[in-house]
Amino acid sequence: METISSNDKHTTKDYIAFFDLDKTLTNSISGKALATAAFRKGLLSNWKLLNAAVLSIEFRLRLRDQLKTIDAMVSWVKGIPEKSIDDLCTEVFNEVLFPSVYKDAISEIELHKAKNAKVVILSSAFTTICRQMAENLNIDDIICS
């Protein structure tokens, strides 16, 4: 788990507003978008893609421990250089995730910030994606995996 704090550490906020990334800030699912892009680039085999689909179903139906499922879902990155994953995350962010940000989500963020809230992304998405979303939407902090 990674926590990134803004530089605005000395300002007292009245409350904290948490936002999930997938299907809350965006109309996309970051893991699905990453898996699709990784498959197209040859970073994810047919077998691993099929396994990810099965794990996704198990996750949604709560057929297995949620944390174990999440760990299994991201196991495909093992052995891939971190730079390659970061580049893939940046590509997916720019081409899929950021363009799918809900306009209402932007309004909600602005509303909370106007009311002196600390705005935080709380997500199981990759750190690179959460960080880029926070920077582009003027979000104060992230808590992500």
Go through each PLM region and give its residues.
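A short, structure-level motif marking secondary-structure boundaries and short turns
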Residues: F19-D20, V92-N94, A114-N116
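Active-site neighborhood of HAD-like aspartate-dependent phosphohydrolases
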Residues: E2-L61
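Substrate-recognition element of Asp-dependent hydrolases with the DxDx(T/V) motif
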Residues: E108-L137, D141-S145
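Residue-level signature of catalytic and energy-coupling elements of molecular machines
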Residues: K23, I85, S123
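A generic secondary-structure micro-motif detector
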Residues: T24, F98, V119-V120
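A metal-dependent, Asp-based hydrolase signature
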Residues: S28-G31, L43-L111
